[in-house]
A protein has these predicted regions:
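N-terminal carbohydrate-binding accessory modules
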Residues: 1-74
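An acidic-aromatic loop/edge-strand motif
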Residues: 2-13, 121, 125-140
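Small/flexible residues
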Residues: 36, 118, 144-145
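The substrate-binding groove and active-site-proximal loops of carbohydrate-active enzymes
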Residues: 44-57, 80-98, 139-147
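Aromatic-lined substrate-binding rim segments of carbohydrate-active enzymes
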Residues: 60-134
């Protein structure tokens, strides 16, 4: 079987809505009528999920490199509240919970990051990622489906 692919001779038209942004490092993400561009070059984002707080910190780099080798260029990750404030008012961003170290490592490996900050998380996490102590709080109204 022979396939003939004909590419349009004209440049892609700008998108209907202006979509362009430049980050503090000077990199630009934009869209035209056909595709996304990153620093002016066509870009196809491929995202994979990695819940850093569920892995030993020493395993992060190896696993991220596997993802990159598989074609992933953006890592999405939840910030599970339940992992960072197990006890009310006591925050833990050490070891496997070190968000800053994880994001910096993603940059070192060459992966972008989408932070999924919640508070609700659909990552098979108890209480949807809310800390256990929150269910005993009485100083706020709880959301309900009741009329």
């Amino acid at each position: 079987m022979i396939y003939d692919v004909k590419l349009p001779k004209h440049a892609p038209s700008p998108g209907i809505l202006p979509f362009c942004g430049t980050n503090p490092a000077g990199h630009t993400l934009a869209a035209n009528g056909r595709y996304l561009t990153y620093d002016g070059k066509p870009f196809f984002p491929v995202s994979g999920e990695f819940h850093f707080a569920r892995y030993r910190r020493e395993d992060w780099e190896r696993e991220l490199r596997k993802m990159k080798a598989g074609g992933v260029n953006i890592v999405a990750t939840y910030i599970f509240w339940i992992h960072h404030e197990e006890e009310k008012g006591v925050f833990d961003f050490s070891d496997r919970r070190d968000l800053r170290a994880f994001v910096e490592l993603c940059g070192k490996v060459g992966l972008g990051v989408i932070l999924r900050i919640g508070p609700w998380c659909h990552g098979e996490c108890r209480n949807g990622g809310f800390p256990d102590w929150i269910q005993f709080q009485t100083d706020f109204a709880r959301r309900t489906d009741d009329p």
